[in-house]
């Protein structure tokens, strides 16, 4: 059988762009979500509206579990010449460690069968959601240039170091339920309509970058923060992921287009893990 060129695996925190769907070259490896006694697999059967309803009605914070090494191994098997894996930040999930273990186990299997090891590389995105998807998009672009496996890895690592992730939460309830925010602070923020602007650190953790009074002002502030770290917008793809708020995503796109001529702006809806973090009305932006 003729070997296939390459495959890109993304854990299900990363939402596939439309052109990546229904193709063997891109694949989501699902995490598992839990709300009280309900277990939800974050795959194509995920129902966002039902999931958000369950979160709203629960007194407890939702939880997630990373894909098992076996789940990754199932998608690594096959006649792929090169496999790239992009995981949720290792500061936020065990997905990276699970994928690394899967890589080692797959190649141990091949060694036992006297076969050559697969070319597999696992990237810690140091991001989440569409940040992972933009990395996949970059890898596909580099593969089309005909670069070597090692050169694709080198350039992708460099791209990850220049990436910036931002997000705004409509509600702080999930943080409150998880014990990361006091009930008093959550109440004050909601009463004053304060929207915190969050972002990723260089290591892939989460930090607060600012805040705005009301969503529109918060979006303006988030765009300004992004422009401060984007000296070459004409060369950058911006990705927006929204949790049940397409009008808000369209508003953000207009604000971006008023600031600069970006290479491309892509909008997607959040899958399960990102819906859990962003919650209803949340919006994520990555450049």
PLM regions and their residue ranges:
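Mixed-charge interfacial surface used for oligomerization/domain docking
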Residues: 2-7, 13-27, 31-32, 92, ...
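Short coil/turn segments at secondary-structure boundaries
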Residues: 59-67, 87-94, 126-127
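Short catalytic-loop micro-motif centered on adjacent basic/acidic residues
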Residues: 63, 85, 122, 239-240
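Active-site cofactor/cluster-binding pocket
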Residues: 70-83, 87-114
């Amino acid at each position: 059988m003729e070997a296939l060129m390459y495959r890109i695996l993304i854990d299900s925190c990363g939402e596939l762009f439309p052109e990546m769907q229904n193709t063997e070259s891109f694949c989501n490896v699902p995490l598992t979500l839990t709300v009280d006694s309900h277990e939800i697999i974050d795959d194509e059967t995920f129902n966002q509206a039902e999931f958000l309803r369950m979160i709203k009605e629960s007194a407890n914070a939702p939880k997630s579990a990373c894909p098992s090494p076996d789940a990754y191994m199932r998608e690594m098997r096959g006649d792929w010449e090169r496999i790239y894996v992009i995981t949720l930040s290792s500061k936020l999930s065990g997905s990276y460690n699970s994928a690394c273990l899967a890589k080692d186990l797959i190649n141990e299997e091949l060694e036992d069968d006297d076969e050559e090891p697969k070319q597999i590389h696992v990237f810690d995105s140091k991001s989440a959601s569409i940040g992972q998807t933009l990395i996949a998009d970059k890898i596909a672009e580099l593969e089309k240039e005909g670069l070597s496996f090692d050169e694709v890895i080198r350039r992708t690592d460099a791209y990850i170091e220049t990436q910036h992730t931002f997000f705004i939460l409509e509600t702080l309830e999930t943080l409150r339920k998880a014990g990361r925010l006091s009930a008093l602070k959550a109440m004050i923020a909601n009463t004053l309509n304060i929207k915190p602007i969050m972002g990723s650190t260089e290591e892939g953790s989460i930090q607060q970058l600012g805040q705005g009074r009301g969503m529109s002002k918060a979006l303006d502030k988030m765009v300004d923060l992004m422009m401060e770290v984007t000296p070459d917008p004409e060369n950058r793809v911006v990705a927006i992921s929204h949790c049940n708020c397409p009008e808000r995503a369209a508003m953000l796109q207009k604000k971006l287009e008023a600031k600069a001529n970006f290479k491309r702006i892509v909008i997607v809806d959040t899958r399960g893990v990102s819906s859990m973090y962003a919650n209803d009305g949340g919006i994520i932006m990555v450049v």
